[in-house]
Amino acid sequence: MSALAARRATAAAASPKPEQPESSIEEVSVSGALTLPSPKRRKTRQTSPKPRSKARYSDDVPTSRQFFQATESLAEQRTGRFSPSAPDSDGGTSSSSVGDSDEDMAQEDEFEDRREVDGERDQRKVSVAANMSSSGPFKSLDLMPVDITSQFNPKDNVNFCRITEGQLASAEMNDGHPGPGVIVSLARNESLTIAGLFLLTPLQNTLSIYSTALSPSMSSFPVYAPTSHPLPVISPASTQAPGKESDKTLLLIRENRCGIDGLRNGAVPGFSNIWLEDNGPWGLRGVHPVVGSFPVPVYPYCTPPSWSHAISSLSSSDVNLQTPFVGLVKGPKRSGKSTFARALLNNLLRRFRKVAWLECDLGQGEFGSGAVVGLWILDKPALGPPFTHPLLPSRSHYLGTYTPLTCPDEYLVAIRHLIEHYKYELQYTSEYSALHTTVHDKISTHVPLVINTQGWMKGLGEELLNVIESMAQPTRVFSFESQSEEVYSGQGWTSTPPWQATQLPYDPAYPTTEPVETEVTQTYSLETAPVSALQARYTPADLRVLSAITYFHASLHPTQSVPVTWDISSPLVCTIPWEVELGIGKALEKVYLIGEGSEGVLEEDLPIALNGAIVALAEMLGSYEDEPTVYEQGRSPPPTDLVNILGLAVIRSLSSGNSVNPGLKLQLLTPLPPSYLSRARILIKSGALELPLPGMIDWRRGGINEEGMLGKGWEEIPFLDVGGLDVIGGERRRFRKNIMRKGM
């Protein structure tokens, strides 16, 4: 047996070994040699055969799409999925979640494997070549898209200069914004991306930001760039003439101490880190340039070519001054509809003194809170997400819901009244003289209108959109392309026919049918905005919570010349309220309840219905015959042409009066200025709109413990019920990964 074993060993040694395939993977090391541990094998069900993807680490240079997809997958791994509109949870346990979906658990398993492969190493400091046209996977999933969004290398006293607060004061930059600044010089092929809060002042040549061109002036524009939204890319405008004496674009960047960065304290869970740290690398508070490696996942604001073409059509040669501009923007959800409408508004402000904005989206208002349709008049561009520029409306109506599904008739009546108010009261104005028009070189004879519609494009939503379009009679329609869907066209199935508007023939016997001579409506087809997986971190419900909390922490002003400020140093439960009396002959006289179930509230239950509720403060524009009582069960609110909504308020508490002074005393939290609050006469309350949970708690460090908050036990805290209910299946679902038995 020993001889046979020896011969077998000799034959095995002499036989050629199979060659190992040469790996095409070139490992990229950040610090020293990088050794990749072999990932654990996991049994997964593959629904469709897919080619094996390339290795994680490759030496090829990515394309732009591959680069963003890779960065987005990293963002999902690092940020996780958190919803501020959902109950908070600690670590991996959750006592408030009823269950997680299979998709969520699969994503968690995938992220665990990635962390095991990465070994929790930081690989952000790997640079990428500027050539983004070649194909192939990227070098590391941990790369930030900084080399794409910023093409600027600051050098002191060359293209970058620091300015002290005293030097700004000597240059007559006394606009109420303290702090130092920096002057940046951008070449024609350079761009700069900044995260945070800052004031932007163009000094030389025209620059572009958020699809908006800003010309040199002494005016400063507040810019809000949280990491929860696309970051603005500042670059020289493409319309700049190449033969100018100086091809450098100079801009001044200063601190913007508006107070909204107080979200770092934790006022809205999930949004505490969107403003990054207080001190920036340039020595400016809250200003974080994206130059070099960046500590958090970000993605830039991109302007598709179709957007640029549509915006460029607003030139002086194309806009007919005899027919006021009325632009309607429509498209599905998540298409960039509101973003483009905001860019359209900003570019119109380059030629017009004022621009009107009609908000038809109940879910996500641009200049106000949700559940309101309104008309806003602006004279300055809005450079930031919707929650950063709340404004007082010119005329608005409160529907008390985030969708017109439950009140389509009231929705159309409110929008019809707003369109009529614009046409008869705001479209043509003689407020400004010819001298003002000449000095500012802007048109002030009429006010253009931008209509932002809802993203509901099917069924009833399509019918509502068609009615709005027929009422507004827009001169320009900007339509976003809908994603193609497979429609079954078999027997018995039909699709919705395309909308077509036809004018009735003119009949002298019926003068009302005379056609109105209007310019042919121009339609622009727009492509959807670039999609990033970072957008999936926050749902529309999360953004509504953020908008509501920041709205009640804001301080609004009657004029847009005074910027909005926020005070988020303390929660709403610790904010000093306004005390207003409710009763006949008092400051607030009547209460109206709207929405489903409102007719069932009895008069004696009115304090219970109002306590802790969000209400709309409205003024009466005319006389209205109504019952001389504070509240009448089932009473309908006054007509829309007699009511104007000033804003929203939270009734923090109320107390009953006495025999000498009957009525109720309300403690209101509202961002309205005193001049607007004194005009309010009635309250409108809907049961579909409630204050989000972050507005009811003390979110400060140490403000909440197991016993309660604010020195009170949980049983003494109003509006909150923290008692859990133990039910079967109420705990979080978990998958067991150690069951590997055959036949199961």
Swiss-Prot record:
Feature: compositional bias, Basic residues: 39-55
Record's compositionally biased regions (Acidic residues): 100-111
EC numbers for this chain: 2.7.1.-
InterPro entries assigned: Clp1/Grc3 (IPR045116), CLP1_P (IPR032319), P-loop_NTPase (IPR027417)
Main location: nucleus
Biased composition (Low complexity): 1-14, 83-99
Regions of compositional bias (Polar residues) in chain numbering: 61-82
Enzyme class: transferase
Record-level GO BP terms: cleavage in ITS2 between 5.8S rRNA and LSU-rRNA of tricistronic rRNA transcript (SSU-rRNA, 5.8S rRNA, LSU-rRNA); rRNA processing
GO molecular function: ATP binding; polynucleotide 5'-hydroxyl-kinase activity
Gene3D superfamilies according to UniProt: P-loop containing nucleotide triphosphate hydrolases
Record protein name field: Polynucleotide 5'-hydroxyl-kinase GRC3
Species whose genome carries this gene: Cryptococcus neoformans var. neoformans serotype D (strain B-3501A) (Filobasidiella neoformans)
